[in-house]
């Protein structure tokens, strides 16, 4: 179902509430990665150009008690927005009250205001995270329309997304629209053939995704730590490699059901320790030494996965192929990333999380059709679940 977007509204003179995702990594009060702020700019700039008054909401981190607040204020985000927009962004260090209400009333057309971290409301009864109806109603009372542009929290039913939406006309911002188009498109109406590449440490994190993608994808390539549970299910010895014993039966059932639809690595890199100084050996997946751990897929597996990608019209990737943080065990992830980036005629999508960070850090950010800003939200969407934040947006 197509959703209404910000361009469907008349915004001039309106107070436009925007739920953005400014949950950025911070160190000593400094933002270390501003990607989420950059991604929010097109929607904010459009509302400014249309003569709307922008009131921004976002969470940052987890706020459990009063002492958490100082390190999790959105003030650095307000400063970053001021710099990127080239105009002063008013920061209100409160989530409710007269100062906030008056500051909103004082806005002129084209002005931007950022409300303090919505999760400050969690200190007293988790009002944000539990979608307190009074809080959602109060925030909604500050504006005329609501634009939800925070895909990263779309799988959560919070006061600042679903709560406001239940009290105010709600549309998608440009980033949310893009996420629905690409991530939702994989699930609902993909351009075939579809190849999915899944990595990461645990099968348990991806059970729903694997199960759903096997209904959609022509091939599901599995790498990373989770692949060794599948090898165990095939009766292979995996040495000290990562194993989820309680998921071996599930992996066996999937392999029996899916047949050659699931493609596993054929070789891997093993070592005795997690270290860039460790002695590395490339071995067949049939020859993993008993005293060593597999930490990356090998070069033959990268070539195999490249072959499987040829001719794909849609590719979705979620999860690294090895211990990407260590350069010794990053080549599998780099190889897969490069192979996908070279597919110029395919829809290439990264489902957030570590694979997104890998692609961006390797300089391939612009070579993918879409890199999702949502980790958990992307996974739940790929599982085929309805996301509360998306459901709450008005249909066209």
Swiss-Prot record:
PROSITE patterns: PGLYCERATE_KINASE
Domain of life: Bacteria
Protein localization: Cytoplasm
Membrane-spanning residues: none
Family matches, as Gene3D superfamilies: Phosphoglycerate kinase, N-terminal domain
Positions annotated to bind ATP: 206, 325, 352-355
Catalytically driven reaction(s): (2R)-3-phosphoglycerate + ATP = (2R)-3-phospho-glyceroyl phosphate + ADP
Positions contributing to substrate binding: 21-23, 36, 59-62, 119, 156
SUPFAM superfamilies: Phosphoglycerate kinase (SSF53748)
Enzyme Commission designation: 2.7.2.3
Pathway: Carbohydrate degradation; glycolysis; pyruvate from D-glyceraldehyde 3-phosphate: step 2/5
UniProt GO MF annotations: ADP binding; ATP binding; phosphoglycerate kinase activity
Keyword Kinase among UniProt keywords: yes
Any one GO cellular component localisation term in the record: cytosol
GO biological process: gluconeogenesis; glycolytic process
Keyword GTP-binding appears in the UniProt entry: no
Alphabetical UniProt keywords: ATP-binding, Cytoplasm, Glycolysis, Kinase, Nucleotide-binding, Transferase
Subunit structure: Monomer.
Family stated for the protein in its record: Belongs to the phosphoglycerate kinase family.
Protein name: Phosphoglycerate kinase
Organism for this UniProt entry: Staphylococcus saprophyticus subsp. saprophyticus (strain ATCC 15305 / DSM 20229 / NCIMB 8711 / NCTC 7292 / S-41)
Encoding gene per record: pgk
């Amino acid at each position: 179902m197509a959703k209404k977007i910000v361009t469907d509204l008349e915004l001039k003179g309106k107070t436009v509430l925007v739920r953005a995702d400014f949950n950025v990594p911070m160190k000593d009060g400094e933002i270390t990665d501003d990607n989420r702020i950059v991604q929010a700019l097109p929607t904010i700039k459009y509302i400014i150009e249309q003569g709307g008054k922008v009131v921004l909401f976002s969470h940052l981190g987890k706020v459990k008690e009063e002492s958490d607040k100082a390190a999790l204020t959105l003030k650095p985000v307000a400063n970053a927005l001021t710099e990127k927009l080239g105009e002063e962004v008013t920061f209100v260090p409160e989530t409710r009250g007269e100062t906030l209400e008056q500051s909103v009333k004082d806005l002129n057309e084209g002005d931007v205001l950022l409300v303090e971290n919505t999760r400050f409301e969690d200190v007293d009864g988790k009002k944000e995270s539990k979608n307190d109806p009074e809080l959602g109603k109060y925030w909604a009372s500050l504006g005329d329309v609501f634009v939800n542009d925070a895909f990263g929290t779309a799988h959560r039913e919070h006061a600042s997304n679903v709560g406001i939406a239940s009290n105010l006309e709600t549309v998608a911002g440009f980033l949310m629209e893009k996420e629905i188009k690409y991530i939702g498109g994989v699930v609902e109406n993909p351009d075939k053939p579809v190849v999915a590449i899944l990595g990461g440490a645990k099968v348990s994190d991806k059970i729903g995704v694997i199960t759903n993608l096997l209904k959609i994808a022509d091939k599901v390539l599995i790498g990373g730590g989770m692949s060794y549970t599948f090898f165990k299910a095939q009766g292979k010895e995996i040495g000290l490699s990562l194993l989820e014993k309680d998921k071996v039966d599930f992996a066996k059932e999937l392999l029996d059901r899916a047949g050659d639809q699931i493609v596993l690595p054929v070789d891997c890199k093993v070592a005795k320790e997690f270290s860039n100084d460790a002695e590395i050996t490339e071995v067949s997946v049939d020859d993993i030494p008993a005293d060593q751990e597999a930490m990356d897929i090998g070069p033959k597996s990268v070539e195999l996965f490249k072959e499987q990608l040829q001719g794909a019209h849609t590719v979705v990737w979620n999860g690294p192929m090895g211990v990407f943080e260590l350069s010794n065990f990053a080549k599998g992830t780099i190889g897969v990333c490069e192979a996908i980036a070279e597919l110029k005629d395919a829809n290439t999508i990264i489902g957030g999380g570590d694979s997104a960070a890998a692609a961006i850090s390797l300089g391939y950010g612009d070579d993918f059709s879409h890199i999702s800003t949502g980790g958990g939200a992307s996974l739940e969407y790929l599982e085929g679940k309805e996301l509360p934040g998306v459901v709450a947006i008005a249909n066209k």
